[in-house]
């Protein structure tokens, strides 16, 4: 559960409406793979991840990034029940994929960076603070199965 003020909820909702999931998801996942190269081990089937330009232009990275942002969007619709919303994804990433749960926090931070880039001056410090709360809540929910 994420506790947002009414102003934070409004900021998140208004700004999220401006987001293009095709762009933001792939860019955020791409940044994760470039900035934290050890995360690439979970994406062996994605082909060429040999350089930043290869990663950022990789269609499989973009497609999976869109899936990530689509799931994130579901979380935004269910801020009062993030653990329930992400229960099956938490189980998948824990039991089958064996993803280090710290990577969820890193990806959340990458999403915030990309949102700042795409939203420009509209992404105020207050808006960033609200989104940081959201991505922290999502990361905690995704890591729930690990506890």
Curated annotation (Swiss-Prot):
Residues recorded with modification Phosphoserine: 45, 51, 53
> Under the GO molecular function aspect, what terms does this record hold?
heme binding; metal ion binding; oxygen binding; oxygen carrier activity
What positions does the entry give for heme b binding?
A: 64, 93
Please give the residue positions where the record annotates the modification Phosphothreonine.
Answer: 124
Q: Which Gene Ontology BP terms does the record give?
A: carbon dioxide transport; erythrocyte development; myeloid cell differentiation; nitric oxide transport; oxygen transport; positive regulation of myeloid cell differentiation; regulation of erythrocyte differentiation
Globin domain: residues covered: 3-147
Residue stretches spanning the membrane? none
* Asymmetric dimethylarginine modification, residue list: 105
Report the coiled-coil segments. none
Q: Provide the alphabetized UniProt keywords.
A: Acetylation, Heme, Iron, Metal-binding, Methylation, Oxygen transport, Phosphoprotein, Transport
Entry GO terms, CC: hemoglobin complex
* Record bears the keyword Protein biosynthesis: no
PANTHER family assigned: HEMOGLOBIN FAMILY MEMBER, HEMOGLOBIN SUBUNIT BETA
Function description: Involved in oxygen transport from the lung to the various peripheral tissues.
Instruction: Give the protein's recorded name.
Output: Hemoglobin subunit beta-2
Q: Which organism is it from?
A: Mus musculus (Mouse)
Q: Source organism lineage?
A: Eukaryota, Metazoa, Chordata, Craniata, Vertebrata
Q: Which gene encodes it?
A: Hbb-b2
């Amino acid at each position: 559960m994420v506790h947002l003020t009414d102003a934070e909820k409004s900021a998140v909702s208004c700004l999220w409406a401006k987001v293009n999931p095709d762009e933001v998801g792939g860019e955020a996942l791409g940044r994760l793979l470039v900035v934290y190269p050890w995360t690439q081990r979970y994406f062996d089937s994605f082909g060429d991840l040999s350089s930043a330009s290869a990663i950022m232009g990789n269609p499989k990275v973009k497609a999976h990034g869109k899936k990530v942002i689509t799931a994130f969007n579901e979380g935004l619709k269910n801020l009062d029940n993030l653990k329930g919303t992400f229960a099956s994804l938490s189980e998948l990433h824990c039991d089958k994929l064996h993803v280090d749960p710290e990577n969820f926090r890193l990806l959340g931070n990458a999403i915030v960076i990309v949102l700042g880039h795409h939203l420009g001056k509209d992404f105020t410090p207050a808006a960033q603070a609200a989104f940081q709360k959201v991505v922290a809540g999502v990361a905690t929910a995704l890591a729930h199965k690990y506890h």
